[in-house]
């Protein structure tokens, strides 16, 4: 026996000597070779030195547990992406990784005990197998030396980490570590949803813990970002965002990224920052309310409240004792039946609840109006709630969603909310309105009562009395709030008039439906902006100041406060509320809500930390931060946003005031078109219109609009061309660039183009990052857009195609642009303080707005 053990150890030693040179700093292990854990630390390293395979002890533990794993090469601390024997650690230092006689990969100890193997079909005598560590981190077992004959691979047997090159399908799961230093299977599993396509789920043991949302479904704030969905699909699937197909991203952007199911229950996406540290880009669930159905059925979650969970009005906890102790999983149930005996419909009502997340509805259909949608729910005793939306106003397409089962996964919040009308029995309404802060964590929430005229006159009197009292108290509260606001300016329209202005006319909306963005209380906005403090002022626009605000949970917003009496200001307010609410695109700024209280008229937008495009490209220092690739992405993003407005949105819209100061930049420098106050809607086959009131910004208006008042989609194309040329040159169109010729930037660009010296227009800050061919392509497109004849200008769909083209030589040759002289010859008597005279006698109303 002793002799046999000695002989076995001798063989291991010989095998180690045979393979040591082949293993250390190698990417391949052949049959009969071994990788031994000892003081030498033998490892397999991928060809490009990106990944390494070897034995490790988790997170520097001092115990004897040894695991075979793969980690990023030469990166500290160790970032392990795959573990072989996660359930069976080797408990001594004598552990060996080898290819067994039957062709399987094995982890064994010095006594030959097997701790892990691949479990694949044994190889034939003639088939030689080898194991190779690829540069993408995939460990592959290959037959006959042919990399196409993959017998087994770690990418199809992951642990807790997903790497570029893997593909998430219905059979793949990511299982978390048990703890920070224990790689055995933990409590959490990430996988594709087996019931709904392209959705993802985190399971906590056998319970659903988190579920992603998909853009285009009814509602879901936990939408999986497009970049991550694309990553998980191995860059093969076409992903849609807001019902629009999104073009593929560059796979090179994912080189140093990983997706991990953590032991804490979070799905996390990381990118290597500067090749040294992992930056967390995305994680879900991000808070307690992001956990699936955190408050149970008919329970609403808001992690910013003192009490995270509350039962909906008219509901009570199923298990009160547990609820009081903070266990909300049991949810809530109705205090009263919603139908009478034998299913007879009685006087039920609906509460309007603004939610940012709710479980999927059970059915949907096209309804002519909200009244029809409400009736569908009311006439069905199983109906718990409904929601209504006008999907396409021009074609009168509407949607009605119905919930027949208990509502779950309810989450309230400020941003991105939708209205869901909860069915409640009449007796429960009065008690809710009167008791203010309820017994089960019900906050003081304004409740909209939709009264159904089937209940008795006595019930009507009770409800109307309660409602009247509530409205009176709310108005007194608002008047008190208005008293604290400085009255430096007085606005000309009443609250009633402006609300009628919002909900009237061109959209033909049902007044009870209103618009698609929430209305906020003035008190909320005053608190968010520190009572419109000057310290929070971002800038002064043509229609009023813009302030930075902070909602609970560090949600940043931008608040535009309408300035003194202005026809343009009121028109802008109406446009931005009722128009932007209907638009959703990644390159359009998002309207989050509005407020009309007394004389105050406020618009709430998503906050853009990097202000506007002009803030960067016209500043000698800041322009260095926008390299050529970033400017190309910005130009393409603006083009896609305009294409959506002109062609792909539910409304066909002309912006009429596109300029660099109206292009806002988010945290990742993605462009967002803003300021739709001057926008116009075109319906049907309408392509152009005329106006006697020319509004816009000097230097960006097309000649036919500035001189004749004629505007069309090609007017926006002209403005886009100016923005393109300004972006690539770093020069303003309204400045003098050739004083002796008195040319605008467009004229200067045209002269350089004709002389085949277009590259001289390049912003000096782009000398190192720009490619000549790419620059000339953008200049070509810009000049095509500013041609004098609108019929010669391309459509935005053609512009997007040309910008995506790889060959500039195939683009059309531009014709002469519309030159605009900046000033007439100065009189010799003019003093230095005299304002320059304009050559045109046309009266122009010009808006000069600072970027937020």
UniProtKB/Swiss-Prot annotation:
Residues 285-321 form the EGF-like domain. Residues 20-154 form the Bulb-type lectin domain. Belongs to the protein kinase superfamily. Ser/Thr protein kinase family. The modification Phosphoserine is found at residues 566, 661, 674, 831, 840. GO terms for biological process: recognition of pollen. This is G-type lectin S-receptor-like serine/threonine-protein kinase At4g03230. ATP binds at residues 538-546, 560. The chain crosses the membrane at residues 445-465. Glycans are attached at residues 37, 59, 171, 187, 234, 243, 352. Residues 621-638 are annotated as: CaM-binding. Residues 466-852 are cytoplasmic. Its EC number is 2.7.11.1. Residues 339-426 form the PAN domain. It comes from Arabidopsis thaliana (Mouse-ear cress). Residues 826-852 are annotated as: Disordered. Residues 532-819 form the Protein kinase domain. Residues 20-444 are extracellular.
């Amino acid at each position: 026996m002793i002799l046999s053990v000695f002989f076995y150890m001798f063989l291991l030693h010989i095998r180690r000597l045979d393979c040591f040179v082949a293993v250390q700093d190698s990417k391949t292990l052949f049959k009969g070779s071994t990788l031994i854990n000892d003081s030498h630390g033998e490892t397999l390293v991928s060809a490009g030195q990106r990944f390494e395979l070897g034995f490790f002890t988790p997170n520097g533990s001092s115990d004897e547990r040894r695991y075979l794993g793969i980690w990023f090469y030469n990166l500290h601390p160790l970032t392990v992406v795959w573990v072989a024997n996660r359930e069976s650690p080797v408990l001594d230092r004598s552990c060996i990784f080898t290819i067994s006689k039957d062709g399987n990969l094995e982890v064994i100890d010095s006594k030959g005990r097997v701790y892990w193997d691949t479990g694949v079909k044994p190889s034939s005598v003639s088939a030689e197998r080898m194991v190779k560590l690829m540069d993408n981190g995939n460990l592959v077992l290959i037959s006959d030396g042919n990399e196409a004959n993959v017998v087994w691979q770690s990418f199809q047997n992951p642990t807790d980490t997903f790497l570029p090159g893997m593909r998430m399908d219905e059979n793949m799961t990511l299982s978390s570590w048990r703890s920070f230093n224990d790689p055995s299977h933990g409590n959490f599993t990430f996988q594709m949803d087996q019931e709904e396509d392209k959705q993802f789920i985190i399971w906590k043991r056998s319970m659903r813990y988190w579920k992603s949302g998909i853009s285009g479904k009814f509602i879901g704030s936990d939408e999986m970002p497009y970049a991550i969905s694309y990553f998980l699909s191995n860059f093969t699937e076409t992903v849609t965002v807001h019902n629009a197909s999104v073009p593929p991203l560059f796979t090179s952007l994912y080189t140093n990224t990983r997706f991990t199911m953590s032991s804490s229950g979070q799905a996390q996406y990381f990118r290597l920052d500067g090749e040294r540290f992992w930056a967390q880009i995305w994680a879900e669930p991000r808070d307690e309310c992001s956990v699936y159905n955190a408050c149970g059925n008919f329970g609403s979650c808001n992690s910013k409240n003192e009490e995270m969970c509350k039962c909906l009005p008219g509901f009570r906890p199923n298990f009160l004792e547990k609820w009081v102790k903070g266990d909300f999983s049991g949810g809530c149930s109705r205090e009263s039946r919603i139908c009478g005996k034998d299913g007879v419909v009685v006087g039920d009502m609906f509460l309007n609840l603004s939610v940012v997340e709710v479980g999927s509805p059970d059915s949907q259909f096209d309804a002519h109006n909200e009244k029809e949608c409400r009736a569908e729910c009311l006439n069905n005793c199983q109906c718990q709630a409904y929601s209504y939306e006008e999907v396409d106003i021009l074609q009168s397409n509407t949607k009605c969603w119905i919930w027949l089962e208990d509502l779950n996964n309810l989450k309230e919040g400020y941003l991105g909310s939708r209205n869901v009308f909860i069915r409640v029995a009449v007796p429960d309404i009065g008690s809710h309105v009167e008791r203010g802060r309820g017994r089960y964590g019900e906050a003081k929430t304004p409740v909209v009562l939709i009264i159904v005229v089937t209940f008795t006159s006595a019930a009507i009197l009770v409800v109307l009395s309660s409602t009247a009292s509530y409205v009176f108290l709310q108005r007194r509260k608002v008047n008190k709030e208005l008293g604290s606001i400085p009255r430096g300016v007085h606005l000309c329209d009443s609250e009633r008039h402006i609300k009628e202005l919002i909900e009237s006319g061109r959209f033909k909306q049902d007044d009870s439906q209103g618009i698609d963005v929430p209305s906020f209380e003035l008190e909320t906005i005053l608190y968010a902006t520190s009572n419109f403090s000057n310290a929070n002022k971002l800038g002064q626009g043509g229609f009023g100041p813009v302030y930075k605000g902070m909602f609970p949970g560090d949600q940043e917003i931008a608040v535009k406060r309408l300035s003194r009496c202005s026809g343009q200001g009121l028109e802008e307010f109406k446009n931005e509320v009722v128009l932007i609410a209907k638009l959703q695109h990644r390159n359009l700024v998002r309207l989050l809500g509005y407020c009309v209280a007394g004389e105050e008229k406020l618009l709430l937008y998503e906050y853009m930390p990097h202000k506007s495009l002009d803030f960067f490209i016209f500043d000698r220092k800041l322009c260095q931060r926008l390299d050529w690739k970033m400017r190309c992405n910005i130009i393409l993003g603006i083009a896609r946003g305009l294409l959506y407005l002109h062609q792909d949105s539910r409304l066909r819209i002309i912006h009429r005031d596109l300029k660099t100061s109206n292009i806002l930049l988010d945290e990742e420098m993605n462009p967002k078109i803003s300021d739709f106050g001057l926008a116009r809607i075109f319906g049907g086959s309408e392509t152009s219109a005329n106006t006697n009131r020319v509004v816009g910004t000097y230097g960006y208006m097309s000649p036919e609009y500035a001189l004749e008042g004629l505007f069309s989609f090609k007017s926006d194309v002209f403005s886009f061309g100016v923005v393109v040329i300004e972006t690539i040159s770093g020069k303003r169109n309204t400045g003098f660039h050739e004083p002796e010729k008195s040319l605008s930037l467009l004229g200067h660009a045209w002269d350089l183009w004709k002389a085949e010296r277009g590259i001289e227009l390049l912003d000096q800050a782009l000398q190192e990052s720009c490619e000549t061919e790419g620059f000339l392509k953008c200049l070509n497109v810009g000049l095509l857009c500013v041609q004098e004849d609108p019929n010669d200008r391309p459509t935005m769909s053609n512009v997007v195609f040309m910008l995506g083209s790889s060959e500039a030589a195939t683009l059309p040759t531009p014709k002469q642009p519309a030159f605009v002289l900046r000033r007439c010859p100065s009189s010799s008597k003019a003093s230095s303080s005299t304002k320059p005279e304009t050559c045109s006698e046309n009266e122009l109303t010009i808006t000069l707005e600072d970027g937020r």
